[in-house]
Structure formats: C-alpha cells, structure tokens
Amino acid sequence: MATFFLIMIYLSFISLGLPDSLLGAAWPVMQAEYGAAFGMAGVINIVIASGTIVSSLMSGALLKRLGTGQITLISCLMTAAALLGFSFAPSIIWLLALALPLGLGAGSVDAALNHYVATHYQAHHMSWLHCFWGVGATLGPIIMSGFMHDHDLWRNGYFTISLIQFALVVLLAFTLPLWKRMENIQSHAVKESQAQPSRGRSEKMLQTKGVKLTLLTFLFYCGAEASVGLWGSSFLVNVKELPAALAAVWVAMYYGGITVGRFITGFVTFKVSNRILIRSGLLVSFAGASLLMLPLPTYYSLIGLLLLGLGFAPIYPCMLHDTPERFGKEQSQKLMGYQMAVAYTGATFLPPLLGWLAAQTTVSILPFFIAFYIVFMLYGSERVNRIMKQRIAQSETI
C-alpha cells in the first residue's frame, strides 16, 4: 500500500511538470494564429504565476480543511480543465481567463505535496520527486513538438496533455480513501512536532527567527534558475558568439544537469545531510557562474552551465525537505505555502528585471547577477544554520 501511494505522489509530480514548458514551446505557432504581440506570452505567464502565488499562500489553510489528498485531486482537476480549455480557446482573452485556474491548480498541489513529502518521507524522495518534475517538464515540449512538427497542431498538444491530467484525476479519485488512510497513519508525527515548544510555535510565523532569510533564499534561488534558463542562450549568442541552435542545446544541457543532478542527489542524501548538500551546491554553482564571467575559451561556458545545473540541483529540494526540521512540522505546513509563493515570485519577476537591465547595458551582466544571487543564498543559508544551532543549544539548557 505504501509503495503504491508513493507511486501516486511521483506521478503527481510528473503531472505537475507537464504544463510548465508548454506555452513557451507552442507560442511561436500560437502567436501567429492569434495575431498576438510577441510579449503577450509574458502576460499570460504572469497571470499563471499570479494564480500560483495566491494558491500557494492559501495552501496552509486549505490543507487544514481538506487534507493533501483532496487538495491534490481538486488542483489536478483545475489544471486538466484549464489545459483542455487552452486547446479550444478562440482568442487571447480566453487564454488569459484560463491561465488563472491553471496557476491556482499548480500552486496548491505544489505546496501540498512538497509539505507532505518533507513531513513524512526522507530527503532522497524529495530530490527524486523534483527530478520527476523535470521529467514532466521535459516531456511536455516533446509531446507538443510531435504535434507541431508537420502541421502546427498545437491545440492537439494541449488536448493530449489535458487527457493525461484527466487520467491522473481519475486515479486520484479512486485512491482518495488511501490518501486519507495514509494521512491518519502518519498524523502521529505531526502531533509529536506540536509538543516541541523550541520551534517558536507561539510566535507569528514571519517573526520567527530565520524565516525571512529562508524566504529570500527561495526568492533568489528560483530567480537565478529561471534567469539562466531564459537568458542563457542570449548570453551565449551575444557574448560567446555561438550559433543560436548550438546555444539552445547548451542551455538544454543546463536543465539536464539539474534533472540528472537531482536524481544523483537522491542517493547522496543517504550519506550526506541536506545542509551540506545545499552548501556544496551553492559552491559548485558559484564556480559555474565564475567560468561564465571569465574571458575563457568558449567550451568553458558549457562546463560553466553544467556546473550551474549540477550545483543548483540539490538546493531547492533540500531546502524544502529541511523546512520541518528547521521550523517544526506544525509551522512548516503554512510556511511551505509561503516558500512556494516566494519561489514563484522570484522565478516570475527576477528574470524580466535582469532582462531590462541587460537591455540598458549588456547581456554580459548575466553571470555577475547569478553570482550575486548565489552569494546571498550562501549567506542566508549559513546564517539560518547558525540560528538553528543557537535555538537547539538554548532548548537543551532549559
């Protein structure tokens, strides 16, 4: 039963990743069909992100009322319905309207599943789950490209992805009693965490020492990851003078580094703690950014991108998994939603900000900003580690 339940969570993470890259993959064809401005894709993406941020912030209260199983079911149903709507949308206005439920569904299920896995499973599952998200994010454009290869049938691509999501909805509906049973079996762990006064239970969450630094670390991590993905090709073409097609392949290898790195990290967590992995990942990624900054032969840029991907790989899942350990299981339920909201905020707004600055100056500023983000993350992470050590020491003296 436990194995089947875990398989359902893994499938949910693949499903979570499937829609994330669809708009970018299909937009050149969608733009021509609708006669829309090139930048309209960014507007649609902001609406999706806004829905995701709102539902992430609400996830703590929703989890208490509905539980993880029902949240996952409802969220996947919203996502499936929105994707189906995309496949029939007659105008841009419809796409904008459907973007909101697409974002709302994604944010709730992301926060709910991350909290559940962080609370009830070991660190390797968190790394592998985010690796499976990468599988979904990779499969989405592949499915879409299959329909657009000869006939530009982007609507069929969205329709197919929606059918996959609806299939998951059916599975979740049939297994809803299993979710409730597993949550009841594992609820004693939450009760134990509520008995730990050292976690600052009586404090308002945002006033808890270390929370704001943690949230800023999530903001800069997702901003850095998304910025490299969005502007990496432009940097390689304009600064390193690579052909556009080759630059796209090198950026794909950056994402491959993240996905493969998370798979490997899952095994490493058996021997190495989350905090050491976060620290190591930040140092490796800083080395990657440094290679992009320096006036070295072009192939060093590929090594730099691979190091960025491999370095980024453990940071996000390990920070998520460390949340209950750092702040207590009771507080982590709401804090996980805050972390998701801040993460999506960073991924949504920091890349356009960097793009605007690059337009005013030069895209060669990319690795310098990424290095700055990494340095801040390292400072924030190490500072929170010291705060946690002080808190543990104080609780032991009481």
List where the protein language model places each region.
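Extracytoplasmic gate region of multi-pass secondary transporters
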Residues: L23-G24, K209-A252, G256-T259
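Interfacial helix-cap and linker-helix signal at transmembrane-aqueous boundaries
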Residues: M30-Q31, L62-L63, I143-D152, L236-V237, ...
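Helix-breaking motifs and short loop linkers at transmembrane-helix boundaries and internal kinks
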Residues: G35, G67, F88-I93, E241, ...
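Conserved MFS/SLC helix-loop-helix module at the cytosolic interface between two early adjacent transmembrane helices
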Residues: V54-I93
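Helix-to-loop junctions at the C-terminal end of transmembrane segments
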Residues: S55-T68, G261-S273, A358-A359
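Cytoplasmic helix-loop-helix junction between adjacent transmembrane helices
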Residues: L98-F132
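Helix-loop-helix hairpin linking two adjacent transmembrane segments in secondary transporters
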Residues: W128-R181
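A late C-terminal transmembrane helix in Major Facilitator Superfamily
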Residues: R326-V363
